[in-house]
Amino acid sequence: MFEISGKYGSAKVYANTVEDSAMAQIVELCNSPLAEGSNIRIMPDVHAGSGCVIGLTMTITDKVCPNLVGVDIGCGVESMYFEPPDGIDFEKLDRVIRENIPSGFAIYDKDTPFSVNLEDELSCGKRINLSRAYKSLGTLGGGNHFIEVNKSTKNENGYWLMVHSGSRNVGLQVETYYQNKARELCANKKGVSKALSYLEGKELDAYMFDMNIMQYYAYINRFRIAFRIMGWMGWSLIKSITTIHNYIDQDNNVLRKGSIAAYKGESLVIPLNMRDGSLICVGKGNEDWNFSAPHGAGRIMSRSEAKSNVSMEDYKEAMKGIYTTCVSESTLDESPMAYKDFSEIESIVGDTVDIVERVVPVYNFKAGN
């Protein structure tokens, strides 16, 4: 662990390796009024993001920058444990997903019922385009979003279905609306960058309210995907874990961007990469870590770097033994080699979580960009 100090605050960094661009973003945050009075902690999977660092957790005060939560509000992983009596038909699973779960930019042709009237309930509902919102519920998206089946290493009959997705296009629109509002409000404030412009007062209250709705939307989106797959495959749910990594925990005033809650006794999942699986963990409730843990292994290559530096031959070799029809040029930027070695994460997180087991992939679906 080392510490970075700035004009308004400091950040403790729980990482062995931090790229220069991520370091610059941490320094910028510590030089921002957002850092004043905040406990800032940087997780082991830290890497540079679009305008702000990923792997961030910080306590919030009377100022919040929507960009720190990001455009995929409420993104996370829904994990469902099951024990199929007759094994898994991977060809059927792949067909079921491809035929029924839109991915990439695809959405449904018809609206999906949702318990919240977004136009009426969202404070910004009449200022954004909601035409895609109801058609996007139950869709995966692209990038690092995935559907995966992981085998338990402790129970030979046990498997975890994992779905990583978020609030889709509607979350992006909500964040964009409020970040633009923040830029307007901070336009004349000296030393406040566009990326770290913030909301206060009634505008902050409106954002927090709408963000909460988006977190619920993201949860229902993941749950719908996972639960429908369980039904189509005839799998019985035994237990589940919900792990969110782009949100504000309003009960405890903790912002997490690319980090997850690790309260004492809380089960959580840390996905590593499409070859090495995920860590099933239990939180220790470490206050110095802001009761948080990393949300993954963290990238060591940008998407463009991965596409330039990783060969298809190496990608195919890395994925041997895992059923997938998604190893292609379009997903090369998500290859295992684009991420940090998971052993680095395992070696650091012992202060904040107990690792129950590492589950290993037997099936992976990931849409190309």
Predicted segment positions?
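Domain-length cofactor-binding catalytic modules of enzymes
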Residues: F2-E28, A35-I42, A48-L56, D62-P66, ...
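A generic, well-ordered mixed alpha/beta core segment in the N-terminal half of proteins
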Residues: P66-S123
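Acidic active-site catalytic centers that drive phospho-/nucleotidyl reactions
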Residues: P44-D45, D72
